[in-house]
Amino acid sequence: MVGASLGPPGRGSLSRLIRLVICVLTLCALSVQGRSESTEGHSKDLLYKYKLYGDIDEYAYYFLDIDIGTPEQRISLILDTGSSSLSFPCAGCKNCGVHMENPFNLNNSKTSSILYCENEECPFKLNCVKGKCEYMQSYCEGSQISGFYFSDVVSVVSYNNERVTFRKLMGCHMHEESLFLYQQATGVLGMSLSKPQGIPTFVNLLFDNAPQLKQVFTICISENGGELIAGGYDPAYIVRRGGSKSVSGQGSGPVSESLSESGEDPQVALREAEKVVWENVTRKYYYYIKVRGLDMFGTNMMSSSKGLEMLVDSGSTFTHIPEDLYNKLNYFFDILCIQDMNNAYDVNKRLKMTNESFNNPLVQFDDFRKSLKSIIAKENMCVKIVDGVQCWKYLEGLPDLFVTLSNNYKMKWQPHSYLYKKESFWCKGIEKQVNNKPILGLTFFKNRQVIFDIQKNRIGFVDANCPSHPTHTRPRTYNEYKRKDNIFLKIPFFYLYSLFVVFALSVLLSLVFYVRRLYHMEYSPLPSEGKAPADA
């Protein structure tokens, strides 16, 4: 009986044990898979990448190339998250500047169609001017462009994936002014969203015609060029803990050893490093976020407890903040700006400053002194350019700033981002706001992935080693503008002067020979003179 009673339960226990082991292994596998998806899921997203060119100093913007019409005419367009229109100069414009490409020729495109309004009203509540639906756009700095609307085929060519093609209503410039007259890029690509009963924007049409993509786009810019990514963001670009490592040697951030070389578990370090900071958008159709503070050396320099509603704008070169906030930050930047390292009196005066002497005492005064001493020790000379903007020789010694978001998370804003490269110096890219509009511009975008999640109405930020695409690597095209230069303006003065001297001497010698010839003809006797006639 004992044997009979123990036999079956033993087999049942073994069976249950096997099932338990299988269940545990399955749960472990699912857990591992879940962790993998949480850290690597975004890398599985389908991403369409587009090269950006430009920089902050020379161009003051970043641009990409898009093909318009049939056959295609390439147009360079400034990437602008602060506006919604796609527009550029068209042939026949007499008030347009000289840009990278020839003005778009509607007659050369068999798919172009002007939006006329002679016999019917303009759609989207547009104005009818001289038989065409009017295009007009004003910008924060005061410039304005105007013309008429037309529609044509837009082809967006990805360097790593297939092209996306759709028909789009665009603006034809017939008048440009201010900055638009002198910019090198030909047009503007607005990246904000469509309003109800408004003209469908580029972003909405792109995702409508590429349903395989998530409705997320990312801007990742370095000192020279960068990328626009449609469909998500790229985890491979994210800065890993312990420093940053350039993407294919092209990044602009400080270079450090990789995670695997540091001896850490790459998966654990990745989870800690890959933390996208998300902030909800506060206005529909535009990319505004709430900023509650701006810290320098641990002290919030922002006076208002309400914070600021700031536009995340890739079309603005610099970050613009209220004047009182700017003055507080600038006071400490001025102290860190030592123009003459050999002036011992001036250097010692700065070193003897106490926290009590400041109108805004610093929470981390010791860090301020460390920064100042580091700048002095490394002889990080500073110069001032237009409007007193400080420029340092090196990045070393400059402080990190911290932007406080609505959830009180403090996001680091590093010197290699808020400073921009100008020749051999690094200049401050923060300015006083214009027209009471605070803006997070390109100096806030630089060296991070700025992720625009349209579906969830939020914007994400994460430090990144953004790829570099210098402008000289940009492919050439048949419709490039060929400047008809005055040849005399291209000749150096010495050669021009020499040509003038040679020309003058040639004219003078010609005159001399001409006069001599006249003299010879008038005063020299004819061969028959002085001789008697043959009959005589």
From Swiss-Prot:
The keyword Transferase does not apply. It is an enzyme of class 3 (hydrolase). Residues 244-264 are annotated as: Disordered. Residues 62-462 form the Peptidase A1 domain. PROSITE patterns: ASP_PROTEASE, PEPTIDASE_A1. Residues 1-34 form the signal peptide. Residues 35-492 are lumenal. GO terms for molecular function: aspartic-type endopeptidase activity. Changing residue 313 to A: Loss of catalytic activity. Residues 514-536 are cytoplasmic. The keyword Membrane applies. One of its GO terms (cellular component) is endoplasmic reticulum membrane. One of its GO terms (biological process) is proteolysis. Inhibited by peptidomimetic inhibitors such as WEHI-842. It is found in: Endoplasmic reticulum membrane. Disulfide bonds join 90-172, 93-96, 117-128, 122-133, 220-466, 337-382, 391-427. Belongs to the peptidase A1 family. Component of a complex composed of SPC25 and PMV; the interaction is mediated via the transmembrane domains. The complex interacts with the SEC61 channel-forming translocon complex and is involved in the recognition and import of PEXEL motif-containing proteins into the ER for subsequent export. The transmembrane domain is essential for localization to the endoplasmic reticulum. During the asexual blood stage, plays an essential role in the export of several proteins into the host erythrocytes by cleaving the pentameric localization motif RxLxE/Q/D (termed Plasmodium export element (PEXEL)) located downstream of the N-terminal secretory signal sequence. Specifically, cleaves after the leucine residue in the RxLxE/Q/D (or RxLxxE) motif of exported proteins including EMP1. Also, by regulating protein export, plays an essential role in gametocyte development and thus parasite transmission to the mosquito vector. This is Plasmepsin V. The lineage of its organism: Eukaryota, Sar, Alveolata, Apicomplexa, Aconoidasida. The gene is PMV.
